[in-house]
Amino acid sequence: MNQEAASNLGLDLKLNISPSLDSSLLTESSSSSLCSEEAEGGGGEAKSMVVVGCPNCIMYIITSLENDPRCPRCNSHVLLDFLTGNHSKKSTS
C-alpha cells in the first residue's frame, strides 16, 4: 500500500524516531552500573541456576540450589529437579 492510498484510509504512516544517543553517555552509564554492582558485592562468581518444580503449586522455579531453596509461592522445601532427576525433599514449613 502506498502512502497516498494510506492517507485516503486515514492512516498515519509517519514514523518519529528519536535522535540516537551519544556513545560516550552509554559507555559512562554502563561503567557506573558495573561499579555499583561491585560495591554491592555483585562482583563475585555467578551462581549456577537450576530449574525445579514445586509439586504443591505445580509451578517451575529458577533458583540456586546452594542456599535453602524454597517455593516462592507456598514456601515449601519440596522441589523437584526434573532435568537431572535429583529431588530436594525436605519437610514443608
Curated annotation (Swiss-Prot):
Instruction: Characterize the regulation of its activity.
Output: Triggered by EIN3.
Q: Which UniProt keywords are given for this protein, alphabetically ordered?
A: Ethylene signaling pathway, Stress response
Q: What does this protein do?
A: Involved in ethylene-dependent salt stress responses by reducing reactive oxygen species (ROS) accumulation.
Which domain of life does the protein's organism represent? Eukaryota
Q: Which Pfam families match?
A: Zn-ribbon_GIR1
According to the UniProt entry, where is the signal peptide? Answer: none
Membrane-crossing residue ranges in chain numbering: none
Q: Low complexity compositional bias: what residue ranges?
A: 23-36
Name of the coding gene: SIED1
Without the gene, what phenotype results? Increased sensitivity to salt.
Instruction: Give the species this sequence originates from.
Output: Arabidopsis thaliana
The annotated region (Disordered) lies at: 23-46
InterPro entries recorded = GIR1-2/SIED1 (IPR055281), Zn-ribbon_GIR1 (IPR056440)
Q: What is this protein called?
A: Protein salt-induced and EIN3/EIL1-dependent 1
Report any one BP term from Gene Ontology.
ethylene-activated signaling pathway
Taxonomy, top ranks, is: Eukaryota, Viridiplantae, Streptophyta, Embryophyta, Tracheophyta
